[in-house]
């Protein structure tokens, strides 16, 4: 069973979802996070272990919903289990929490763990891509998806291309010839300066190159 666990493949581009992580208050840019759908976990479990050789069980502990994901070990003739807790969904509370717990338990088995090795993803946005939500914060019309992804032997992400729903490349990482679409933006700072040409390119490169929240806040301060 250990060999089977090690044979769990990295996720395909079509199996990965892009969701907004953070967005600048003025809507001029956002970060993206890579996610997997619970159906991906089920598909890979069926592929690697077989439909009859895994099972899931949910328990409520201190008000939290846990998922126990068990795999049948044919050599030991016993079930081997890994568990994790889910977080609530903003829409369907119980269903979302159960799905999240299942996906987290799948992470513990190695399904989609490579998503944690990805680069920080920053997307500059155009004004017509953003609208004001009911809460008053900026929200996106544009949807993003993974066009291409590549891994090394350690199952770490070494190539990543993200496109929008108009099939324009909005982010590229690694050894790729894809040309990233340059949004028609003009970012003004407090003194009224407008970033264009070389200055705009430099600002965008700084945004797309950050790798931590602290670095992101520093770049935001430089290009408010």
Annotate each PLM feature.
Residues 1-6, 13, 28-53:
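OB-fold ssDNA-binding interfaces and closely related basic DNA-contact patches used
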Residues 40-183:
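Positively charged, aromatic-enriched nucleic acid-contacting surfaces
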Residues 22-34, 85-92:
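Short histidine-centered catalytic/ligand-binding loop motif
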Residues 1-30, 123-224:
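Interfaces that engage single-stranded nucleic acids at replication/repair/recombination sites
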């Amino acid at each position: 069973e250990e060999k089977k666990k090690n044979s769990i493949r990295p996720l395909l581009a079509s199996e990965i979802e892009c969701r907004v992580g953070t967005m600048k208050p003025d809507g001029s840019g956002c970060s993206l996070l890579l996610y997997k759908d619970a159906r991906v976990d089920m598909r890979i479990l069926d592929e690697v272990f077989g439909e009859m050789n895994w099972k899931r069980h949910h328990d409520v502990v201190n008000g939290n919903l846990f998922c126990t994901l068990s795999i049948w070990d044919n050599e030991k003739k016993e079930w081997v289990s890994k568990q994790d807790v889910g977080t609530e969904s903003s829409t369907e509370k119980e269903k979302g929490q159960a799905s999240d717990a299942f996906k987290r338990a799948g992470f513990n088995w190695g399904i989609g763990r490579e998503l944690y090795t990805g680069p920080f993803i920053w997307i500059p946005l155009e004004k017509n891509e953003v609208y004001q939500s009911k809460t008053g914060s900026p929200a996106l019309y544009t949807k993003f998806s993974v066009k291409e992804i590549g891994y090394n032997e350690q199952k770490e992400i070494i190539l990543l291309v993200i496109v929008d729903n108009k099939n324009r490349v909005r982010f590229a990482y690694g050894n790729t010839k894809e040309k990233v679409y340059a949004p028609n933006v003009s970012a003004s700072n407090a003194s009224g300066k407008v970033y264009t040409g070389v200055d705009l390119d430099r600002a965008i490169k700084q945004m797309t190159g950050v790798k931590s929240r602290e670095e992101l806040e520093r770049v935001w301060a430089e290009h408010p």
